[in-house]
Amino acid sequence: MERSTTSDTASEKPNPSHSTGAVQMRIKNANSHHDRLSQSKSMILSDNVKVLEPINRHRRNHSQHNLTLADIISTPDHTVVEKEGYLLKAKIADGGKKLRKNWSTSWIVLTSRKMEFYKESKQPALANLKPGYKPECVDLCGAHIEWTPEKSSRKNVFQITTVSGNEFLLQSDIDFLILDWFHAIKNAIDRLPKERSCTSRNLEFKLRRSSSTELLNSLDTESKESKPEHRKSLIFRLNYSASDSNDRSRVKSRLKKFISRRPSLKTLQEKGLIKDQIFGSHLHLVCEHENSTVPQFVRQCIKAVERRGLEVDGIYRVSGNLATIQKLRFVVNQEEKLNLDDSQWEDIHVVTGALKMFFRELPEPLFPYCFFEQFVEAIKIQDNATRIKAVKTLVKKLPRPNYDTMKVLFEHLKKIAAKESVNLMSTQSLGIVFGPTLLRPEKETGNMAVHMLYQNQIVELMLSEYSKIFGSEED
């Protein structure tokens, strides 16, 4: 091996004594400090040849490192990097246990099966040079990705939930950048198999969460070359359960009889044992059930906010405690007597959060899917008077529950905007909060950023021109 004394570049020449199947490795260090942390490697290996000798390489600090072929092959991930870059990240759950949200900037590397989080862009290169270095990793097999504007006051936030119960929020203020990341991760998830391996890992997670770990611990023990008696015990349990087919068939037949004797859903509903939920039901069904055109829960929330929340800083923008919001959701779904002035709902952000959740969970949004493109075309009209008239015409065509609920809601939001000097919530701010919640396309396309802009503008226009849009025909 030769080393130049005038350059930072070190090269290795293959040993002539090696066979043609030997590994040739060249490690080149660049002049800059940043590039020295990220080294490029090239390797040539002919087929059917075992390499037993380690490959020596010299670094500028003259320290010796031995790198065998096994070390190279056992590197955790040699898949192609599909995308990498900086995003804001917050881990909000670990194994199903909720964590405090803490945003930090991370260098994210996306491959075909997983994502890795690093503190900076240099670390992926350092990870390959430091044995045992493990970045925070997200297995995408069986994972779920969705936009979650309710989880943060920041814009452009989406959440990744893994089968192991980990939850991550990712965010960027740059619209096209976050959209690219969302679609890249979603495509990676969609390409992965959703059977067997993912299902088994999901089952293992559920077993661990329910403390049913006897069999799992036994399997772990076996994989770690446990004592022979432990292996025999595990084999005995597995064989015993496999040979007990008669008992299982009897249990199965009893379950079939039990299920066949269960009353139908209609019978349970007629007896009042099962009731339609308020959250997640179609708007017209909720109104039919209550014999009204505006859901009672919507009216209650609006009255509570107007009593004690009109002057609260960031009303509707600031998120309330999610656990308390879910508790309020449960009370409403059980049709229990609701008093929003009760001390447990004293945080007005819990009330506003529940109201936003109600509209967000409607199977069809307040602006029905079939009207979405028509509203978008109307907001594109340049002339303001013509634009207002087009929007008013569309609003008048809405189903009665949608129109009446929309009128009540926007009248309320107009009162919020009137207190802008105190609560700092302008019509534009309210448009950003409620735009994606109240209207959205039935199927998301690549124009998500453009749609989001139109959604905000439509809500903003309807607030600023409320009297003209919801007024009489002569207005």
Swiss-Prot record:
Domain PH stretches: 80-190
Membrane topology of this protein: Peripheral membrane protein
Compartments it resides in: Cytoplasm; Membrane
Keyword Ribonucleoprotein: no
Gene Ontology biological-process entries: small GTPase-mediated signal transduction
GO MF, one annotated term: GTPase activator activity
Protein role: GTPase activator for the Rho-type GTPases by converting them to an inactive GDP-bound state.
Protein's UniProt name: Rho GTPase-activating protein 15
Source organism: Gallus gallus (Chicken)
Gene: ARHGAP15
